[in-house]
Amino acid sequence: MAKINRKWAVVTCLMALLIWGNSLVPGSGSGSLSLTVMEAIRGFLHSVGLPYEWVTNFVVRKCAHFTEYMVLGILATHAFDFEGRRTFDVLLPTAVFLLLIPSIDETIQLFVPGRAGVITDVMIDCCGAATGVVLRYLLRSLMCAKKAA
């Protein structure tokens, strides 16, 4: 079993708790926050002369799912594979962790008023996490190549 970097494991767990905390916000509060973000993005795009009609509450919510799990993927990979070994004994626990967290997240939402846990969000979350894992390995490879040069 790979050695886990404890400092990064704590940061990773804090990120998971932040995600779960967001899921505990009732639908009205969550929807209000999403609408505020949507209006800010639309206002910015409009001010620079770009099309903004495509930015909807739905798009903002799904991008938030993807982004928070991309960050979690980066952090988890750093915690589970601090040395950049990319071996099965490192990747398997990372993958299980990154599947378990969104599954729990969507289950939490089943019990929060105005929220719904849906499998499509788990899939979006897992895609975000996978993107984070890939980005972390790409960044590590680039940094190692730069040091070697």
Feature names for model-found ranges:
Residues 1-74:
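"…centered on the first transmembrane helix and the immediately adjacent amphipathic helix/loop
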Residues 4-10, 85-92, 115-119:
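Membrane-helix interface segments
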Residues 12, 73, 94, 98-102, ...:
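Small-residue faces within membrane-embedded alpha-helices
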Residues 14-19, 90-110:
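Small-polar-interrupted transmembrane alpha-helices in polytopic inner-membrane proteins
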Residues 68-83, 127-143:
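Membrane-interfacial alpha-helical segments at the cytosolic side of multi-pass membrane proteins
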Residues 76-84, 89-98:
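Post-HEXXH active-site segment of zinc metalloproteases
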Residues 102-126:
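Interfacial helix-loop-helix junctions of multi-pass membrane proteins
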Residues 145-149:
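Short, charged juxtamembrane terminal tails flanking transmembrane helices
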